[in-house]
């Protein structure tokens, strides 16, 4: 990895959602430091903090701390929940017409991951003005899962609905689907974060970086309506 980073001035770090992500971060930031990388742009996560009560946010905070401590210059990008998650996991809603949520009516200002990528690319092209900055990237509105499903219903013309489920029932459903415990624990921490209102904030940062209003869920649902068609 040290050889790979030789001569690199700006490094964009996006770690996979994997049990080893802290190990990956440790090795990567050490190598970047040793290679003399000038600026590290790190894609983190909403609410990332060493002091977070939520498991995944706390782990993201640990990685952010490594970036801050080992980088000559750094910028942190903290995106919210991705709109694309509803596309990637569209099957239950597509086949049953029902989306089950354990978020208790909590709101998220979901963001189009393509716009996160555009913002990160803009920073990486000219990182100096963003040195030491942390940007929270969200969509333009905070909405409940029921409101998101309503956007999808309007886009597809289907009778879709969101049904509440308990945190325990959600865990059991994820386990039955074959997800490992480490994934379930972290997804549960995100659901708790939403239920407790910690994901409902709307930040102006993405609009400033893009120079325009970010995509809303209604527009996104219209563009991707085929994913939820029966």
PLM segments and residue spans:
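Periplasmic-binding protein-like
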Residues: 12-15
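Conserved Rossmann-fold cofactor-binding substructure of NAD(P)-dependent oxidoreductases
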Residues: 1-9
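Short linear loop/turn motifs
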Residues: 187-193, 220-224
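Short amphipathic alpha-helical segments at helix boundaries and their inter-helical linkers
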Residues: 192, 196-204
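Amphipathic terminal alpha-helices
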Residues: 205, 210-230
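Oxidoreductase cofactor-interface core, primarily capturing Rossmann-like NAD(P)-dependent enzymes
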Residues: 6, 17-26, 30-39, 45-161, ...
């Amino acid at each position: 990895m040290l050889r790979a980073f030789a001569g690199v001035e700006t490094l964009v770090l996006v770690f996979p959602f994997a049990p080893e992500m802290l190990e990956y971060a440790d090795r990567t930031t050490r190598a970047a430091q040793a290679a003399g990388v000038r600026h590290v742009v790190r894609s983190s996560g909403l609410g990332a903090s060493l002091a977070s009560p939520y498991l995944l946010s706390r782990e993201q905070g640990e990685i952010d701390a490594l970036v801050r401590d080992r980088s000559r210059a750094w910028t942190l990008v903290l995106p919210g929940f991705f709109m694309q998650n509803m596309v990637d996991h569209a099957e239950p809603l597509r086949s049953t017409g029902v989306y089950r949520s354990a978020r208790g009516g909590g709101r998220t200002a979901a963001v189009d991951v393509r716009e996160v990528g555009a913002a990160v690319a803009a920073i990486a092209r000219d990182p100096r003005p963003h040195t030491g900055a942390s940007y929270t990237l969200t969509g333009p509105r905070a909405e409940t899962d029921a409101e998101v499903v309503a956007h999808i219903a309007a886009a597809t013309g289907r009778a879709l609905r969101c049904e509440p489920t308990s945190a325990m029932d959600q865990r059991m459903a994820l386990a039955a689907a074959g997800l490992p415990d480490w994934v379930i624990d972290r997804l549960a921490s995100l659901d708790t974060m939403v239920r407790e209102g910690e994901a409902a904030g709307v930040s102006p940062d993405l609009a400033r970086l893009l120079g325009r209003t970010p995509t809303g869920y209604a527009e996104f649902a219209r563009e991707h309506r085929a994913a939820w068609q029966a």
